[in-house]
């Protein structure tokens, strides 16, 4: 529902212009991986923060870097894992920079953003809901990975099923 022809992320990647977004989903559903893939698909300076280990000074430093990036025509993409762990004042620090386009924010959360992310930030971001992959989807991904590694014939279907079950 997020990827594929005429889906929001596909349009953003094709236009090389990401919108600020909040990725909401359970642990292990691919929020961080998706953010890294998006960063790799656009020409932006990518920075990743954990709301658990980062504070306002880290953000101020990044905003200064983003200003220097802007002067040379470089966009700045900021990924904040566990954005719901920032308090309201910390989340407020993003607002002027998201509004001005100085940064593009991708926040990841396992919590309902309607309750954990401040409304002004939500209104300037697109909320994308990620769902965990089911066993068949995981097996398909594993098969694809094994093909690219030329190891597909050495792994039994039972082993693939077992690996897929371990991911839950």
Features from the language model and the residues they span:
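A short helix-turn-beta junction within AAA+ P-loop NTPase domains corresponding to the substrate/partner-engaging
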Residues: 44-47, 118-132
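Loop/turn-to-beta-strand initiation segments
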Residues: 19, 71-77, 100-106, 126
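Walker A/P-loop
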Residues: 11-49, 64-67, 95-96, 100
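Structural recognition of the conserved hydrophobic beta-strand(s) that form the central parallel beta-sheet
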Residues: 49, 79, 104-110, 129
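Conserved Walker B
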Residues: 82-86, 90, 111
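Short regulatory helix/loop adjacent to the ATP-binding pocket of P-loop NTPases
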Residues: 95-98, 112-126, 143
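Conserved C-terminal "switch" segment of AAA+ ATPases
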Residues: 71, 127-168
């Amino acid at each position: 529902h997020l990827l594929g022809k005429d889906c929001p992320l596909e349009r953003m990647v094709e236009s090389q212009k990401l919108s600020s977004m909040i990725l909401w989903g359970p642990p292990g559903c691919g929020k961080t991986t998706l953010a890294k893939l998006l960063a790799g698909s656009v020409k932006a300076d990518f920075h990743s923060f954990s709301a658990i280990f980062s504070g306002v000074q880290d953000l101020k430093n990044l905003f200064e870097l983003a200003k220097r990036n802007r002067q040379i025509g470089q966009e700045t993409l900021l990924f904040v894992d566990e954005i719901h762990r920032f308090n309201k004042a910390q989340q407020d620090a993003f607002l002027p920079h998201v509004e001005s386009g100085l940064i593009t924010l991708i926040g990841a959360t396992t919590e309902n953003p309607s309750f954990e992310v401040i409304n002004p930030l939500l209104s300037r971001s697109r909320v994308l809901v990620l769902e965990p992959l089911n066993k068949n989807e995981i097996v398909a991904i594993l098969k694809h990975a094994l093909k690219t590694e030329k190891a597909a014939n050495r792994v039994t279907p039972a082993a693939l099923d077992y690996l897929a079950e371990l991911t839950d």
